[in-house]
Design a protein with these regions (language model features):
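Scaffold signal of the M16-like zinc-metallopeptidase fold and its non-catalytic homologs
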Residues: 1, 47-93, 108, 307-357, ...
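Single conserved hydrophobic/aromatic residue that forms the stacking wall/gate
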Residues: 2-8, 12
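Short beta-strands and strand-coil junctions in structured, solvent-facing domains, enriched
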Residues: 13-14, 26-33, 196, 208-214, ...
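Acidic/histidine-enriched segments that form metal/cofactor-coordinating
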Residues: 19-22, 32-64, 246-352, 514-532
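Buried hydrophobic packing residues in well-ordered domains
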Residues: 20, 44, 99, 185, ...
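Extracytoplasmic
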Residues: 32, 39, 94, 109-112, ...
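Proteolytic maturation boundary segments
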Residues: 38-42, 69-215, 361-363, 368-412, ...
């Protein structure tokens, strides 16, 4: 008995289903290749090694999952030490033939189940039961050849680049980091931690981002990150890269933000050089793959068509239009827009953003040995191209709509539901205290709405509050409140939501709510001290915003009063900027 569940893309195309069943039959009939098995085994053993290295830092959730599987399925709980030792002995000695026998047992000639799921949309046709059964019965008569796994023995980089030099080094910099300046202008901050034995995080960032490009490129820069990724790097397609990196714990990806271009990475300490090589190739050798791009477009069209069938997809589009007043840089992706994506222009834009590393700052946080890392940093990051541009981001005039704006529209839904979004915006200085006050306000509102809307009225599963304090391109504050309910209750509950927000602006929070939030924030702050991601964000914020988001944190949290929160929320509401978007169902 086997169930095969896959996203088929254009499910109405019978060829997709036929190919899926055909490849399953090929694996059943001929099995896997030695190279496929070797990669799968290497990846499995690497994941075990990572868990073993982190055994002193195992999260509670990992134990819970093991206990649940033991209770439900009788799965043993040997512990990671025993499992790691056992599998390192067993895995290399399990022959490929044994694996292929298991595949034949998993996919028998009978007792097969094919499940096809997709949107109910007019004009979208699915294979019938008879067609599926016919396909299944025809598999055993197909003329198939064994799969040939094309594996290159070519290294990720044939030769190391002509590296640069570290021209200055300063220990004891911000947050206990070491600052390195390279000969090509790249600045590096390295913070060694012992929070995770098997993790090094990396971020490289530079000012500019999407803001550098004109409005007419909005569609292209909206999809740039995904399009660039499908091509692979250097001489390797995306598929070939996964083969080359088998058994390694490493990843690197590039991204274009509104005001910055960034490269992100993570690796095990033993794979640090591989991360440096991938970073070098990310800057210097993005790969064009027309076939992979066409496949990407087909997948994207299918995803967008599926999203269109989901009424909830329209609420975000409506909110974005309301917020930015149909600004040309706000792209609402539709299936018919996919063919307008210009691959060559995307590559041109990407290369423009990454052809000059001289203004990039890199941060490394984790179990990194500085003396081992320094020559690799100099060799690969020091070799990145530099033309010494002096850049910053541009103001693209994407201002949030001022005043009061309301939009209510109806859409047919399988389960009649009203979705309501409130957005309040205004000016606010970008300070640590305001950032803390915003967190207080959203958490207090979450508790108030749980009590007043969910528990007393029973009208929703929950009201969610989100806040965002921004410094660039200009200082502003956003508060968003979202909930779903029965259309018959939407007006009453929306009234309660607004009234409770106004009450907070007039009276501030209760002592009980205030103390609960303080306790949580202080505990979270203490927990964060042992998180690599927390220190990575602090390093980035320090240099991007020019602000230490840790200095005096606990003192500020402890000093916050109900009056502080009342004034903070009141100052926002007094600016009079409110957007309300409601999606409901047609009146019958």
């Amino acid at each position: 008995d086997v169930e095969r569940s896959r996203g088929l893309g254009d499910v109405y195309k019978r060829q997709a289903l036929k190919t899926l069943l055909q490849e399953t039959e090929r694996a059943r009939r001929f099995g896997f290749t030695e190279s496929e098995y070797a990669r799968a085994r290497a990846n499995y053993l690497q994941s075990l090694e990572s868990a073993y290295n982190e055994r002193e830092k195992t999260k509670h959730g990992s134990y819970v999952r093991e206990y649940v599987q033991n209770f439900l399925n009788g799965e043993p709980i040997p512990g990671i030490e025993a499992k790691y030792a056992m599998m390192n002995q067993l895995a290399p000695n399990i022959p490929l033939q044994a694996m292929n026998m298991v595949m034949q047992q998993l996919v028998p000639d009978s007792n097969q189940v094919v499940i096809i799921a997709g949107p109910a949309k007019e004009g979208l046709k699915y294979p019938t039961k008879e067609e599926v059964i016919s396909l299944l019965k025809g598999m055993k008569d197909l003329d198939l050849q064994a799969y040939v796994d094309k594996v290159s023995d070519e290294p990720l980089m044939k030769e190391a680049p002509k590296g640069g030099k570290i021209i200055s080094e300063k220990e004891g910099d911000i947050y206990g980091s070491t600052k390195l300046v390279l000969s090509n202008g790249v600045t590096v901050y390295v913070k060694k931690t012992d929070f995770k034995a098997d993790e090094i995080r990396m971020k490289g960032t530079s000012l500019g981002g999407k803001s550098i490009f004109p409005d007419k490129d909005a569609l292209n820069f909206a999809v740039m990150d995904n399009v660039i990724a499908v091509g692979g790097l250097g001489n390797f397609s995306q598929v070939d890269l996964t083969k080359v990196l088998a058994g390694k714990k490493v990843s690197v990806n590039a991204g274009l933000g509104a005001t910055t271009e960034n490269v992100f990475g993570t690796c095990s300490p033993k794979d640090f050089e591989t991360m440096m090589q991938l970073t070098y190739l990310t800057f210097t050798a993005p790969r064009k793959d027309a076939e992979a791009f066409e496949s990407f477009k087909n997948r994207m069209k299918a995803q967008l068509e599926s999203a269109q069938a989901n009424p909830l997809s329209s609420i975000n589009d409506s909110l974005q239009k309301a917020m930015y007043n149909n600004h040309p840089r706000v792209v609402m992706m539709k299936p018919e827009m996919v063919d307008q994506i210009d691959y060559d222009r995307i590559l041109e834009m990407y290369n423009d953003r990454f052809k000059d590393a001289s203004d990039f700052t890199f941060y490394f946080v984790g179990n990194i040995d500085l003396e081992t890392a320094k020559p690799l940093i100099a060799e690969y990051l020091g070799a990145l191209p530099a033309i010494n541009r002096k850049e910053t981001f541009k103001d693209t005039k994407m201002s949030i709509r001022k005043g009061v704006y309301k939009n209510e529209y109806a859409k047919e839904q399988q389960t009649p539901t009203a979705t309501i979004v409130f957005l309040y915006s205004g000016k606010a200085p970008y300070t640590l205290k305001n950032d803390i006050l915003l967190s207080f306000a959203t958490q207090v509102l979450d508790m108030v709405y749980t009590e007043e809307v969910r528990e007393k009225e029973g009208g929703t599963y929950g009201v969610n509050c989100y806040g965002d304090l921004q410094k660039y391109p200009k200082e502003q504050l956003l508060l968003q409140i979202v909930f779903q309910t029965d259309p018959a209750k939407k007006d009453k509950l929306a009234g309660i939501v607004v009234d409770e927000l106004k009450k907070l602006a007039a009276e501030g929070p209760s002592d009980v709510h205030l103390q609960k939030v303080k306790e949580y924030m202080l505990k979270k702050y203490a927990d964060n001290q042992k998180e690599n991601g927390y220190w990575m964000n602090n390093l980035n914020d320090y240099f991007y915003y020019g602000m230490d988001m840790t200095e005096g944190y606990t003192d500020i949290v402890n000093s916050i009063t109900a009056k502080d929160i009342q004034k903070f929320v009141s100052d926002l509401l007094k600016q009079g900027n409110e957007i309300e978007v409601t999606m409901t169902v047609p009146n019958k």
